[in-house]
Amino acid sequence: MRILRANLLPAVGLLVCAAAVVAGDKGEKKDPPDKPKVTNPGLEKLKSLAGEWIMESVQEGADAKPEKKTDEQVAIVYKVISAGSVVMEHMFPGTPHEMVTMYHLDGPDLMLTHYCALGNQPRMKAEKSDDPSKLVFKFAGGTNMDPAKDGHMHDLTLTFVDADHIKAEWTYFEDGKKSDVTVFELKRKK
């Protein structure tokens, strides 16, 4: 009988504690406190691009003339994802040259990772710009490449011409130096 009482008393105590916890909880799930939202004017500007964009012209190479596009096909789709913390740029959807660029913050810094059709993933960091209509990104490393020799996108300048027109200038490096610049002029699909 003493053994039963000795084992029963802690078990009853445990049940009382468990009942108190359950009664206090009332089955309500509590969300963790919200993290303070860190924002960046550049990321907010990128969020304004959400939607479909049509290629107006392409210029491949500094000496080339811009090639006007008339097919009105969607070339880029911007989407705000991850509770507003990331902007996804989906380039050339449904084509063999399909690519994705993710714009996000790293602390206060605006970054991008470009998932290139070349199979590498350059990262770039936005620099301070005196021109509020431009976001200028510079190479900050990458994966699946040796930047001293492998071809990769190295810099990007996005110019916000107006609410419905942008220009993207992608700088390509090979063998550790600038090789080419491709310029896309885009308009928002209405």
Task: Map each language-model feature to its residues.
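Bacterial N-terminal signal peptides
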Residues: 10-19
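Bacterial N-terminal signal peptides that target proteins for export
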Residues: 1-11
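Hydrophobic small-molecule pocket/channel-lining residues, especially in calycin-type beta-barrels
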Residues: 24-190
